[in-house]
Amino acid sequence: MTQPSLNPLVIKLGGAALSCSQTLSQLFGAIASYQQKEQRQIVIVHGGGYLVDELMEKLQLPTVKKNGLRVTPYDQIPLIAGALAGTANKLLQGQAMADGLNAIGLSLADGGLCQVEELDPELGAVGKATPGDSRLLQTILNAGALPIISSIGLTAQGQLMNVNADQAAVAVAGALDAQLVLLSDVSGVLDGKGHLIKSLNQQEADALIAGKVITDGMIVKVQAALEAANDLGRAIEVATWRYPENLEKLFAGESIGTQFLPA
């Protein structure tokens, strides 16, 4: 049985993993194998930007981003909610079920898990999530199921909102008092010699950015991870799904990527 000291684990799943059934099968297979031996509770939070991009292209609708966040016109949110809370969520649920897991598909709104408000009028139907009531989610976890949660939420007035998946994962982890791992294409942050940096704070990250060690798209990932650690008030981890043999170590509380430290 799991040590009582291990809090639930929230895994934010992103990057190319969402579009690769083999990668997903390796991830869910590792979760199934781990949970046969240990009882740590695991939650998946996902986005699905690639599905939205494909949908927008098919419908010949422009994709506009502001400061890295997708602008979501209110007349498009039903389509985007369908892609994320519908297609992406059910594809993940289906793969998890095929790999032997009792998976349940949810959104941020279910059971009042997260409270969502409009983030910025210029972004349209884009929401900011804050931790809400985790009782329904905890009941599902206690039943031995794997919740798979999309980053679609509802305001108190019932308005659909698209929430950045990293930020959604922070809110879910906050509601559950859980450890958070952002699982993506990258193994973490590398130093100038290509070695994995085990932990990073804002001051160290600023120095690496100034020294051109952290560049381009990685700057956005690093700043988002540090912001997530600050929001959650505890260290979070960025790790990769590329090495399934390492995933069970991650589930057991061992660091396999870069730990981002709150200020």
Curated annotation (Swiss-Prot):
GO terms for biological process: arginine biosynthetic process via ornithine; L-arginine biosynthetic process. Pathway: Amino-acid biosynthesis; L-arginine biosynthesis; N(2)-acetyl-L-ornithine from L-glutamate: step 2/4. Gene3D superfamilies: Acetylglutamate kinase-like. Belongs to the acetylglutamate kinase family. ArgB subfamily. This is Acetylglutamate kinase. The keyword Metal-binding does not apply. The gene is argB. One of its GO terms (molecular function) is acetylglutamate kinase activity. Keywords: Amino-acid biosynthesis, Arginine biosynthesis, ATP-binding, Cytoplasm, Kinase, Nucleotide-binding, Transferase. It is found in: Cytoplasm. Pfam families: AA_kinase.
